Regions:
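Short, non-transmembrane amphipathic alpha-helical segments
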Residues: 10-14, 45-65
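Short edge beta-strands and adjacent turn/loop segments
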Residues: 15-34
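Short beta-strand-to-loop capping motifs
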Residues: 37-41
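C-terminal low-complexity, charged extensions that often adopt amphipathic alpha-helices
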Residues: 68-70
Length: 81
């Protein structure tokens, strides 16, 4: 799996866990990216549950470092890009 497929998979998992999530992706290299998720605080645990195991698997089995960072949309507004 490449970084683009990993990002697509994780963003789909996030969207399923929280329909209200605003997602911002920053690709740093062919093996590294960060996904910032701005969602209601009550969705944080569901998002983490949907992504945590997969991000660890990507790191240990695929060598891909994709960080998923969850922010409360009520206190942290997402950037435009």
């Amino acid at each position: 799996m490449g970084i683009d497929e990993a990002i697509t998979d994780l963003t789909a998992r996030i969207s399923t866990a929280s329909l209200e999530a605003v997602i911002r992706v920053k690709r740093r290299s062919d093996e590294e990216a960060s996904i910032r998720v701005y969602a209601p605080v009550e969705h944080e645990e569901a998002i983490k549950a949907a992504t945590q195991e997969q991000t660890l698997r990507l790191l240990t089995e695929e060598g891909l470092d994709v960080q998923v960072l969850v922010y409360d949309i009520a206190t942290s507004l997402p950037p435009e890009q």
